[in-house]
Regions:
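N-terminal leader/signal peptides at the extreme start of proteins
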Residues: 1-15
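N-terminal compositionally biased, intrinsically disordered segments and leader/signal-like regions
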Residues: 8-9, 17, 51-54
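Sequence-pattern detector for short linear motifs
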Residues: 9, 47, 101-103
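N-terminal single-pass transmembrane signal-anchor helix
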Residues: 12-41
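A generic helix-loop boundary/linker signal
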Residues: 20, 28-31, 47, 185, ...
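Aliphatic-rich helix starts adjacent to a transmembrane/signal segment
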Residues: 35-56
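N-terminal pilin/flagellin-like segments and related low-complexity appendage regions
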Residues: 51-302
Length: 302
């Protein structure tokens, strides 16, 4: 009996059910925390990658945008633009620059349709036969393509690629990681790190953050005439009869609340982590999903 007692006391006590459940619960909590940390780390990396992509694209966009402006300022406006400007040569030159920008950077397939008489190109360039060769290429590339929510992204990709003039690294090689055909329509789009198409706004104006980004000093002449293309305020003249037509076709000119011109620059946007853009056609906020959007004008160029 003494021997049996010694043998019994030497046996290792097993875990109780409660102890096993506690261990399992601890492991589950640690696994959940680890998974959360990994997901959070991936989210931060996706954010950084998207910001890097947008900065790269914006740098390329700004270079091509500036080139189109410089060339347009050397040209004489078309008769149709001069008529819209009410015969004012300075105002006509400002409008002509915006016309050329609309030609170089379309945001919708219909803007390239030769059969739609009300497009900017068909109204103000085509009658004088001065359509740029790259626009003819645009028309061929989008022929038969249907409109949709991704077309501004496809249009920007098409423009940046077609307008490349230097002999360096090809545009596609620079951003091939950010190109995909997300909807299978045969037109590639520029995408963010979450795989969603970026959006491109050519002449946005209705966004408080964008207007606050005006780099000119408050109270200065440049702040009042904050349209970078119309630094003289030619479009703000109240006696200009063609202004309603211009605003309907391009963008509103004057902020009625402040009396200043709108700060109008091209903008590239990602829907961000929640993958909801929630923006109107004028860059206005249309829902809570816009809160985490990533805007090009908020990122400093390297």
């Amino acid at each position: 009996m003494f021997q049996n007692s010694r043998i019994s006391s030497g046996r290792r006590r097993g875990f109780t059910l409660i102890e096993l459940l506690v261990v399992i619960a601890i492991i589950a909590v640690l696994a959940a925390l680890a998974a959360y940390a990994v997901i959070a780390m991936m989210g931060r990396q996706q954010m950084r990658n998207t910001e890097s992509t947008i900065k790269t694209l914006n740098k390329l966009l700004q270079a091509r945008w500036s080139s189109v402006i410089a060339e347009a300022r050397k040209e004489a406006p078309s008769p149709e633009v001069l008529k819209l400007a009410g015969g004012d040569p300075e105002r006509a030159q400002v409008i002509w620059v915006k016309v050329r920008l609309a030609e170089a950077f379309p945001i919708a397939y219909k803007e390239m349709d030769p059969l739609v008489p009300t497009t900017i190109v068909n109204m103000y360039i085509a009658p004088s036969g001065r359509i740029k060769s790259y626009f003819t290429k645009y028309r061929a590339m989008v022929q038969g393509k249907l409109p949709g929510p991704t077309e501004s992204s496809s249009c920007l990709l098409m423009a940046l690629k077609t307008l490349q003039t230097d002999g360096g690294v090809s545009f596609e090689d620079q951003i091939k990681y950010a190109v995909a055909d997300t909807n299978g329509d045969g037109m590639n789009e520029l995408v963010d790190a979450w795989g969603n198409p970026l959006a491109f706004y050519r002449f946005p104006w209705n966004n408080a953050d964008l207007q606050a980004a005006n780099p000119a000093a408050p109270g200065s002449r440049n702040f009042k005439f904050s349209d970078p293309i119309d630094t003289g305020g030619n479009l703000m003249n109240p006696s200009w009869a063609g202004r309603p037509i211009f605003e309907a076709q391009f963008h509103p000119v004057k902020n009625i609340a402040t009396g200043n011109a709108y700060f109008v620059i091209p903008v590239i946007v990602s829907a961000g982590p929640d993958q909801k853009m929630d923006l109107g056609a004028d860059l206005s906020v249309a829902g809570a999903g816009a809160a985490d959007n990533i805007f090009s004008f908020k990122l400093k160029l390297d």
